[in-house]
Design a protein with these regions (language model features):
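Peripheral interaction segments used for macromolecular assembly
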Residues: 1-87
């Protein structure tokens, strides 16, 4: 498996879309990561849509929704996530 490095600045402000349904979930506001290793843990979503709110995901201390980075399938013009891995 090829490991690809992703920088937080490359995904901030990109729209988050469901791989399965094409539904828009919101916009990447920031990422949560481990400082020592640089491992990305979660995408922090701002401007959440009703579709994202319906998934009852974990939220941070500011009430922003967290999408585990393990659910991210691809990053390009959009951040594509597997909705099946969120429920």
């Amino acid at each position: 498996m090829v490991e690809t490095r992703v920088r937080a600045k490359d995904i901030v402000k990109k729209t988050v879309i469901s791989e399965e349904t094409g539904r828009r979930f919101g916009v990447v506001g920031n990422v949560d990561f481990i400082t020592e290793s640089g491992e990305l843990l979660n995408i922090i979503v701002i401007e959440p849509t009703v579709h994202l709110k319906d998934l009852n995901l974990k939220a941070d201390e500011k009430g922003r929704y967290l999408i585990p980075f393990s659910a991210v399938k691809s990053i390009g013009d959009y951040v594509i996530v597997s909705e099946n891995e969120l429920v």
